[in-house]
Amino acid sequence: MLPKLKISAFLLKRLERTKQQCSGCLFGVFYGEGTLLLLSFNIESSLGQLNYEQIQHRFPAELDLCGLVKFGGCTDGEAHLNEVIKSVDITDNPILLQCELGTLVGLRASFFVHGKLEEVPYEVMEAHQLYNDFCFTRLQCGFFLQTAATPESVAREMHVLRKRVADGNLVFNVPQTKIFINNYGPLDKQFSGDSQIQDLIDVIPTPGHEKETASVDKKKLKGQNTPVKRLAPTGCDYEVIPIDVMRSRSRDPVSGEPPHPALSIAVTNEEQIRVQVPLEIEAMAILCRKTKLQRLYDVLIESICRGLRLFELSLIEHLTESGSGKLLVPASYHFYPQEFGHFVSCAYLEGLSDDTPSMLMRRKRLHRQFALPISRPYFRRANQMLFLGETEDAPWTPLLNTHIGLRPSGVVDGKEYLVNGNYHYYHYLQQQVQDKGWGCAYRSLQTICSWFVLQGYTNAPIPTHLEVQEYLHKINDKPAAFVGSSQWIGSTEISMCLQGFLNVDSKILHVASGAELATIASELAMHFQTQGTPVMIGGGVLAHTIIGVDYCVQTGQVKFLILDPHYTGADDLATIQIKGWCGWKGMDFWAKGSYYNLCMPQRPILY
């Protein structure tokens, strides 16, 4: 019986944007009673060795090679076909997608059945259904690798280490609970052989919920206010289950002794001098919530092995390319490109900055393999996923993406053009700064800077009011008395600061009166389509941040999505949305008799 085929809406949009004749590999998740969900693809080079195996190691465990995609009249796919088919493990029926260039019209999906193609229908899985049906695990563990500083030795010792990992001696634990999972399954009596991943999720409180489950070690938590929490990844709606790793003293599933940390596993070979390299692994897996909990152990082992393969690749590449004979320490980074709808992992070496030639080359190669533009950062360190709820002592951060969940603007036949990516909402009185009445433009600047940080363009800290004033004095825009004062700034000063702090250029747009703001609706729409950055608007009145427009070309009706920095209350999303501090505003919001200047930051070309 052929698998039931579903395709992620994220993947379909990526396929539609591909406008070059080429072929690539498809990656998907096989789950339930014979359903194949296609989630991702890569572009294969027409020359040299295929790269799908290395790409698969970057994906969460369970996201596996399952077929081939051909774009246009590409003939490269014929050469790749046999090799790819032989490498597909998750199904006996590899899949072939045939796409026209730049369109989904005519998209055909076929399974290989006894060497012949059989065309099949498919269902589209939208984002909300993905978030409802699937979750991720994020596992953290450490090992020591003892190896000579040669590619051959690293490959050999990594192979041995992976075998040790898979020997059945590891035990997994949900942090701060007594939920342990070994190679026989979960050790907690509340779970049975029929238990599913969702049953595990149900006993883990969400971030911010101060409750303990029956499985929480109450002695350990006595006197603490740190209940176990699911992790909330920034900018997406997947739930992420945290996992720790331990070693079992016994393979006996009923052993009464608790496991102990796995951080001392080492691989040694006394015939050669060895360098000890610490390996701090962070590994991910994707799971259908209805997956049997009994399968979790094997999935987590595979996620560790994928992380180790990424480390191996990064170490060997560096040794081969640099010729230095020096081993650097690798680290795991997880990325969530908004276009993908799933995580991608990379291993970067400490001591190599993002701007070293080898790092630039690797990222450029990744962009090409994933059909991503070489003009925006996706895999710089600053792009790495942040997991909320990970630590109790995490530094304060403002609310993220406060416009999500707002009701529609009400513009008839309008089209929304919104900020592209993540931002933080900065407003009056945050960080104990008494800036009510004068700090609105400073707060708008901070919101804009947060966008560039969260999109991976920079690691620079968000500038404070004082730092802004000191910089404007430094470039002779303001007198010395301005530093430490309560004087406001405008759009021009914002553009100067963006250039000075972030090396970001801005476009300044002048509007003679609030009544004329409707005339620039199309220009704002184009800005959000091409640049996607928040826009600061000031002039003769108070400053605000525009993060979107809803515009009907036929009627000219427009509403502006405003982030208001004048809010002075607590960071409560419901209050901010209900009271309109983040919301859609019509033309009556603007002062008809006042002029306005808009600072429209431009994305730098960076990857």
Swiss-Prot record:
Gene3D superfamilies with a match to the protein in the record: 3.90.70.130
Annotated Pfam families: Peptidase_C78, UfSP2_N
Assigned keywords, A-Z: Hydrolase, Protease, Thiol protease, Ubl conjugation pathway
Lineage top rank: taxon: Eukaryota
Keyword Magnesium: no
GO molecular function: deUFMylase activity
InterPro entries reported for this sequence: Papain-like_cys_pep_sf, UfSP1/2_DUB_cat, UfSP2-like_N
Stored SUPFAM superfamilies: Cysteine proteinases
Record-annotated active site: C440, D564, H566
GO cellular component: endomembrane system; endoplasmic reticulum; nucleus
Gene Ontology BP term (one): proteolysis
Presence of keyword Amino-acid biosynthesis: no
Enzyme class (EC, first level): hydrolase
EC number(s) per entry: 3.4.22.-
Physiological role: Thiol protease which recognizes and hydrolyzes the peptide bond at the C-terminal Gly of UFM1, a ubiquitin-like modifier protein bound to a number of target proteins. Does not hydrolyze SUMO1 or ISG15 ubiquitin-like proteins.
Entry similarity comment: Belongs to the peptidase C78 family.
Name of this protein: Probable Ufm1-specific protease 2
The organism of origin for this protein: Drosophila melanogaster
